[in-house]
Regions:
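A glycine- and small-aliphatic-rich helix-loop capping segment at beta-alpha/alpha-beta transitions
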Residues: 89-100, 122, 186-195
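Gly/Ser/Thr-rich loops at beta-strand to alpha-helix junctions
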Residues: 76-86, 175-180, 258-260
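ATP/nucleoside-binding phosphotransfer catalytic cores, i.e., glycine-rich phosphate-binding loops
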Residues: 2-17, 36, 41, 47-49, ...
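Glycine-rich phosphate/diphosphate-binding loops that line cofactor/substrate pockets in enzymes
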Residues: 58-72, 245-246
């Protein structure tokens, strides 16, 4: 039986093309049943205050960096979205006097315009946000060397190689409306993928690359980062891929309700917990990663029901 067309963008794959039973099962999850989805390799965490939520995310950076030594460089591959943890990271590093001399950081992604990654003068630049919200706030004597900061904005093969040369302790991130991590979006519904999206095995072969963004992602970034100004959001981005993700010891997804909604926060967890990987829901591919953690701000879980505004 052929899969339905997307309700949002018929020329693309996305979660609206799933078996309706999967969607219905996810929508039924209560706060209690969502928490019980934890299984070996997949752990659900709840936080009752937003302060604790972002402090816990910030501590992941610090805990990873404290493992780094001259003989064993260690890093973290971090997102822009969420960003609220970044100033807290800098404050903890400064307060505890933690030297980042041997620590590393990978930026997950960066916008691309006309085939070229945007510079830090672009208002939506992710590198710009990382430096303004975190790195420039760290005491100069504690900062990591610039060569230890890696963005997917140059030689992407070299960027990928660093994940083999350096231990990526943790890859934290958020979840987008397309159920992506980084910019691992669903693909267009054309060519060999006209009738079915890439298999999980095919999608997992993707490494860092420049990719076309799903219309949902463009709209979301205009809403969350650009005041709704869609014209200012690039249509392509360079992104970390599944290859680098599977070289990371832990994947840690933080959901405060700012980016995805109550249904989306349930759907990806359901598919990971029940091991239903489908590249129309890229986050579901993490069902096959050995160490995934989902962190929720409890008040954002809400319910999947009618709430008129």
């Amino acid at each position: 039986m052929s899969r339905p067309l997307s309700k949002v963008a018929p020329e693309w794959w996305d979660y609206t093309t799933l078996d309706p039973e999967i969607l219905a099962d996810a929508a039924k999850l209560t706060e209690k049943s969502l928490f019980k989805l934890s299984r070996p390799g997949f752990t659900v965490h709840y936080y009752d205050t937003i302060e604790e939520f972002y402090a816990a995310e910030a501590l992941e950076y610090v805990e990873a960096w404290r493992k780094a030594t001259a003989d064993n460089p260690v890093g973290i591959c971090g997102p822009i979205g969420p960003t609220e943890q970044l100033p807290i990271v800098a404050r903890i590093v400064n307060a505890l006097g933690i030297s980042l001399k041997h620590a590393h950081f990978w930026g997950m992604d960066e916008w691309v315009e006309d085939g070229v990654p945007v510079g830090m003068d672009h208002p939506l630049s992710f590198a710009k946000a990382d430096f303004e919200l975190c790195f420039n706030r760290i005491d100069k004597k504690l900062r990591m060397p610039k060569e230890n900061i890696h963005f997917p904005s140059g030689d992407l093969k070299a960027y990928t190689q660093t994940f083999s040369d350096i231990v990526c302790d943790t890859m934290p991130g958020g979840q987008g409306d397309t159920k992506h991590w980084a910019f691992n979006d669903p693909v267009r519904r054309k060519g060999k993928y006209k009738d079915a999206p890439p298999t999980p095995e095919e999608y997992r072969k993707l490494s860092a690359r420049v990719t076309e963004l799903h219309p949902i992602t463009i709209l979301q970034n205009a809403r969350t980062s650009g005041g709704g100004y869609v014209a200012n959001v690039p249509k392509s981005a360079a992104t970390v891929g599944p290859v680098e993700t599977w070289k990371s010891n832990k994947v840690s997804i933080w959901q405060a309700g700012t980016h995805d909604n109550p249904f989306g926060m349930r759907l990806s967890a359901w598919m990971i917990a029940k091991k239903i990987p489908d590249s129309a829901v890229p986050m579901s591919l993490l069902a096959d990663h050995p160490n995934v953690h989902f962190h929720y701000y409890r008040p954002a879980i809400k319910t999947v029901g009618a709430e008129m505004h």
